[in-house]
Amino acid sequence: MSAEVYQPEKDTPAENLTYVSELTDGRNLYQISITLLDSNGHRSYQASSMLQVQVVGGRLLGLENGDLADVTEYTANYRRAYHGELIAYVQADSDIPAVVTISGEMLKTLAVTVPANN
């Protein structure tokens, strides 16, 4: 399993920045792209493992997998990967970095750090 952290505000067109800021109360919003990998380190398109996401020092806003048939509540802290991917939206709400832990059955637990809200 791998994860990359993105900050949508840095790639958002200027006309949309106010909207993003209103949604997040001016706090930083991060998108974490989670990819399930095979034993060779390649994305496993067949993987649909149930993943759980825990956040310490921040807030999980939602999980998205791109599967239109998945009716899991958006704000739940669990969701199945779809075609080997899952996206977590996290908000830092303190002056310390948030730690995001991703786990799943028969998968190594992965922890990523999200920068503090400055």
Model-derived features with residue positions:
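Edge beta-strands of extracellular beta-sandwich domains
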Residues: 1-9, 108-117
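Solvent-exposed, conformationally flexible loop/turn segments
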Residues: 24-29, 95
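Short aromatic-acidic-glycine turn motif
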Residues: 52-70
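Short, hydrophobic beta-strand segments
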Residues: 74-94
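Low-complexity, acidic Ser/Thr/Pro/Gly-rich terminal tails and inter-domain linkers that flank the onset
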Residues: 1-25
